[in-house]
Structure formats: structure tokens, C-alpha cells
Amino acid sequence: KLVKQQLDKVQIQAEKSAPLSFVQESFKSSSAGILMFLTLIKRYGIDTVISQSNYPGTSVINKASSIFCFLALKLANRRRYSSDDTWCMDRGMGLFAGLNVLPKTAWYTSYSDRVTTEMNRSFLKQLHQLWMKFGLLEDTANLDFTTIPYWGDDAHLENNWSGKRGKALGSMLAVLAHDPDSGLIDYGSANVLQKDESAVVLEFLDFYREGNKKKDNKLRYIIFDRKFTHSEHLKKLDQDNIKVITIRR
């Protein structure tokens, strides 16, 4: 019993995040596989887009490493990162972001509060240009709404239908644009209000054209649910030579 009690009390303190000095060393990691993505990130110049973005850095962690911290969790499939923070001791995940270890959970919350919609939209436009440059976007886009549940005080949020849960709940309504050939998510917004739902397809079209410097509009088809927008907006799409494929549920 005494041994068990002593083991229960053992707590390992994670190191504080700091820029990596890149001295020769060896360590074990359960998430070293995410380092394979660095080759793709470099090949397509995504690291350059991140460095040129408007995202902030912190006093200790620079802009690029800050974004790579979020990428590390996403690529390692850490969905509920606040309930199990053993990842902040994994040296491999820290190496991915150019740090000794990833910062703790509170850092992510604090950083997210500093990120604005304008920063995200500007970043998406830069990525859109990148995908076009490398021919990763074809002439078709899938558009769909998704409900993001909010488990805190949701009095300030609208009730949106969640097909996954089979009910309406206080949540954020987001829209995603997906390229069916490459699998890329080309556009996204989590600020959709119910009164603006039907205009989202036109907002996506504006985004697509604003992010295309060469003005060679490759987009020809948009696929969405039949209730996604109304007839007036469908007429505008037709005038822009955009064909619509609707899905009946």
C-alpha cells in the first residue's frame, strides 16, 4: 500500500518551452512520425507562407513556431489536448515546432485569443494561391456547413442543428470548402450567422477570386445541399458561369 501511495504522488514536471538549440542529442518520442510532414511543408513553401502571415509571435516562441505548435497537435491527432497533456513532454513534437517541447495547454488558449478573423482569412488566401500554383485545386468545390458544439455558457450563441447528435444545440456554425480531388480544405469560416447562411456561397466565390492573382477562374462546379442557398443567389452563380450540383438528403 505504501509503495502504491508513493507512486500515485509522483508527478513529472514538464520543461518550459524554449527555442531549440539544435545541438547533437538523442531522445525517444512516440510522435516522431509527424516529422515526415516537414518535407511536404518545405516542398510546397507552406513554411514561407506561415512566416509571412500576420499571425503573432510571443516573447519566447516566434510566429512560425507558434503555428507549428498547433500543427503538431493536429498532425498527431491530439483531439482533446486539454484532458491529456502528456504530449507537452514529447521531445519529438517539440522538435517539429523548433522547440525543446510544446507549450502547455494554457498557452494555446492565450494565443488563440490574439488571433483575429482577418488573420485567418489572409492566411487562407495565401494558401489558396499556393494550391493554385501547384495545380492542387480542380474545377469543383464541395461546400457544407458543420456545427461546432460549445460546452460552456452558450447564451450568446445561436442554436444550430447537429446531424451527428440529432438535435439543435448552442454552437458555432462553420462552413468548409473542400476540393474532392486533392482532399484539400481550401476555405473555412466559423463566423456564420443563420441570417447570412444563404449568402455564404457568394462569399466563398469572392474569396476564390480575391485569392487568385492570375484571375484565371478555374472554378466551374460547386456541390452543396439543396437548402444551402436560395434561388436569387443561384441566379448570380449562373451569371458567373458556375454550375451547381445539389444533393438531396
Cite the ranges covered by each PLM segment:
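Anionic group-transfer/hydrolysis microenvironments
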Residues: 146, 181, 227, 248-249
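Short, surface-exposed basic-aromatic patches at helix termini and helix-loop junctions that form
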Residues: 213-216, 233-243
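Short, surface-exposed recognition loops or helix-turn segments adjacent to catalytic cores
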Residues: 144, 219-220
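Acidic, His- and aromatic-enriched active-site or binding-groove loops in soluble protein domains
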Residues: 165-167, 242-249
